[in-house]
Amino acid sequence: MMGLTEGVFLILSGTQFTLGILVNCFIELVNGSSWFKTKRMSLSDFIITTLALLRIILLCIILTDSFLIEFSPNTHDSGIIMQIIDVSWTFTNHLSIWLATCLGVLYCLKIASFSHPTFLWLKWRVSRVMVWMLLGALLLSCGSTASLINEFKLYSVFRGIEATRNVTEHFRKKRSEYYLIHVLGTLWYLPPLIVSLASYSLLIFSLGRHTRQMLQNGTSSRDPTTEAHKRAIRIILSFFFLFLLYFLAFLIASFGNFLPKTKMAKMIGEVMTMFYPAGHSFILILGNSKLKQTFVVMLRCESGHLKPGSKGPIFS
């Protein structure tokens, strides 16, 4: 019989999954319909749309994992099922993180203003830079997925020894090796984190310099350039903090097998991991003028303040 903890876990998982799917499907529908009408899509819209699609897939993988943990733990821990989930999750997860990083770099190159030759060279070739970054993101995501092979082998040996309940020096050695490889696997997260932090720092410096220039000229600091800086900073900063929360949840879920309350640790980790792909996508909607306007119109239609089909004041 399902207990209170399991019930709360399933309710939270289902709620976050539903909200995440709605938010990311909204992005897909708005950008998809815009592309269908104009047959054109900006680089930022392409990244956001692809990111939303990956997050829909990621949420489905996490929900499947959550239900297997609750209703079929033996199936979840079996070799082939665990490997399929891990491979799917690792590739989708790393690619989505890199796409969010690429989006931050794109905002930085388009909005920040520096006279350094290297920055200007990158700024003038922003489209080419982003194409190479996206290709690099794909290759690094494949590399992180391929690195699971040794981890799977060690996990199989580790579980085989554990099943015999023969806790020997060999068992402890294999467990230590598995810990080490698993921890080293988290190093794949460092490059996108460093790049995001660099983009955030450049935008902060650029905003500070721009604000000082506005004050010296006696003009308002709330000009379009300043607002663009602030909007990009909010998006990158939210990604940074949500990613750290997501990374913590990943560690809890991954090392759940080695904690005293295994199932509880896994459930906490699974619930926390769903917050990032839903929360950051909602922040992307608020930071994108087209998505935000469509979202506001939709809310007004739902509340009865605006008739369906009318544009409303925000489009005038």
Curated annotation (Swiss-Prot):
Record family assignment: Belongs to the G-protein coupled receptor T2R family.
Bilayer disposition of the protein: Multi-pass membrane protein
Purpose: Gustducin-coupled receptor implicated in the perception of bitter compounds in the oral cavity and the gastrointestinal tract. Signals through PLCB2 and the calcium-regulated cation channel TRPM5.
Keywords: G-protein coupled receptor, Glycoprotein, Membrane, Receptor, Sensory transduction, Taste, Transducer, Transmembrane, Transmembrane helix
Positions in the Extracellular compartment: 1-6, 64-94, 150-186, 256-266
Record-annotated membrane-spanning stretches: 7-27, 43-63, 95-115, 129-149, 187-207, 235-255, 267-287
Entries under InterPro entries matching the protein: TAS2R
Keyword Transmembrane helix carried by entry: yes
One matching Pfam family: TAS2R
Compartments where located: Membrane
GO biological process: detection of chemical stimulus involved in sensory perception of bitter taste
Glycosylation sites: N166
The name this protein goes by in its record: Taste receptor type 2 member 3
